[in-house]
Amino acid sequence: MADEDLLKGVRRLEWARTHMGLLREVRRKLKKERVFEGLRVGMALHVEAKTGILALTIREAGAKVRLASCNPLSTDDSVSLALKEEFGLEVFARKWESREEYYGNLNSVLDLEPDFLIDDGGDLIFLVHTERKELLDSVKGANEETTTGIIRLRAMASSGDLMFPVISINDAHMKYLFDNRYGTGQSTMDGIMTSTNLLIAGKRFVVAGYGWCGRGIAMRARGMGAHVIVTEVDAVRAVEAKMDGFQVMPMMEAAGNADFIVSATGCKDVFTSEHIDAVKDGCILANAGHFDNEISKDALVKASKGIEKVREFVDRYDLSNGKSVYLLGEGRLINLVAGQGHPVEIMDMSFSLQALALRYLSQNHQSLENRVYDVAREIDEEVANMKLETLGVRIDKLTESQRRYLTDWTSGT
């Protein structure tokens, strides 16, 4: 069985490497520049094939790397095994980790005494600032992958508690326009369909949150024939959802007729005790946000007279009011708990940003303040141009006359 899992993991890594042409070019550049030689890099990301290729890329460019999962349920055990046994990478991760295992594995990564961190959700960075403060002198900076982590880190920076510079990969154009929208949209639907084997067409499909992730989910659900309803707390995004052709209403109203409710907000208590009495019997609840607090499991447990696992990633909550609801993947990231995460080509772009931003950090950390920075525009454009090249797409360039026009305020009617 172990041999089968090892072969499965190796094949998944090879498939990912084959289809990650951008990262292959980035690896070539980094090996030539030798900028990572002697560095120690601690990583907390979803441990699956695409992440494995990023970790191997950074190691092949000269760094010593340790990798843990950023979510207790998102590890692909076959890939984790292959990274350790076939490629000799130091990996501390397994699927279905307990809370103690999860934080123990993060601490194992930090035992490397890393120079730089690559995080997803902010737990690794948070740990350095709380239980592992002795590392604040050695950690020179970090990259953060996702919306939820950036929300936490901006709060830390605004309160003066962030003690090293962090680059927000999430806010790069080549990340959120593609990873958050197309990646989350496709992979969330994949996770829902894999876990339930139910039809999407004709169903009432509620998407909580109309940020880039919510946009992607709503777009894909509509494309599969669902009647999509959006819930929001932001008036601007609500107007946008309405103009995009979706119904918009409060969650209390939407829950009563929902066949599916998917949360993608980055905030807690999106679906909680006040919604349980209103929810439609048989409704399926799923989370596409990083943490498992968007759908309140405590509220579901308190309102239930019984809980039963009915499929591998599906728990039925029999409510005291006589209704039942189904929670997918224990309320954690459904696209990684039940699916394989974002498409390979999407993560090729995001992880190329990660590697190039790490290069930028390693070369510029001494001049950076302890706050959250956007990815440098030249890095965003470098990845975009590489992607166009792999797609065989050519675009126009501004002429010198056009450049002068765009910078000349005297030009008018």
Indicate residue ranges for each PLM-predicted region.
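Glycine/serine-rich phosphate-binding loop and adjoining beta1-alpha1 elements at the start
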Residues: 2-36, 69-203
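A short, aliphatic-rich alpha-helical micro-motif
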Residues: 110-111, 200, 254-256, 276-280
